Swiss-Prot record:
Organism field: Thermococcus kodakarensis (strain ATCC BAA-918 / JCM 12380 / KOD1) (Pyrococcus kodakaraensis (strain KOD1))
Taxonomic path: Archaea, Methanobacteriati, Methanobacteriota, Thermococci, Thermococcales
Protein name per its UniProtKB record: Signal recognition particle 19 kDa protein
Record text on subunit structure and interactions: Part of the signal recognition particle protein translocation system, which is composed of SRP and FtsY. Archaeal SRP consists of a 7S RNA molecule of 300 nucleotides and two protein subunits: SRP54 and SRP19.
Record's function text: Involved in targeting and insertion of nascent membrane proteins into the cytoplasmic membrane. Binds directly to 7S RNA and mediates binding of the 54 kDa subunit of the SRP.
One GO-annotated biological process of the protein: SRP-dependent cotranslational protein targeting to membrane
Disulfide bonds: none
Alphabetically ordered keywords of this record: Cytoplasm, Ribonucleoprotein, RNA-binding, Signal recognition particle
Keyword RNA-binding listed: yes
């Protein structure tokens, strides 16, 4: 299945009115297009198109700080909802690893 993914679809700071598609508990704070791309690729999804500067038209009426740029066209064997949940989970893992690695460096 091919579909478009906007960072706003998994951003916990946004209400569903502005395009969040996953539950707030699953969503992430300020996901970047690069994080989404990396997570999708790790999960075996194919990133067909990547435009980090594109702005979701649904976000034109909200505060600048909440406007997350980026658009990805992804091909996945799973439906969009499941793919987004998987991507959120993977980004959460990657962020935890990054924090852990940062923490280890500081202790030395």
């Amino acid at each position: 299945m091919k579909f478009v993914v906007w960072p706003s679809e998994i951003d916990s700071r946004l209400p569903r009115k502005y395009g969040r598609l996953v539950k707030k508990e699953v969503a992430l704070e300020a996901p970047t297009p690069e994080e989404i791309r990396d997570a999708a690729e790790i999960l075996g999804m194919k990133v067909i198109e990547f435009e980090p500067e594109k702005l979701n038209p649904r976000l034109s009426g909200i505060d600048e700080e909440l406007r997350t740029k980026g658009m990805l066209r992804i091909e996945s064997p799973y439906p969009k909802g499941k793919s987004l949940r998987m991507i959120c989970e993977k980004i959460r893992e990657l962020r935890a690893k990054k924090r852990k690695a940062h923490g280890k460096r500081k202790k030395r």
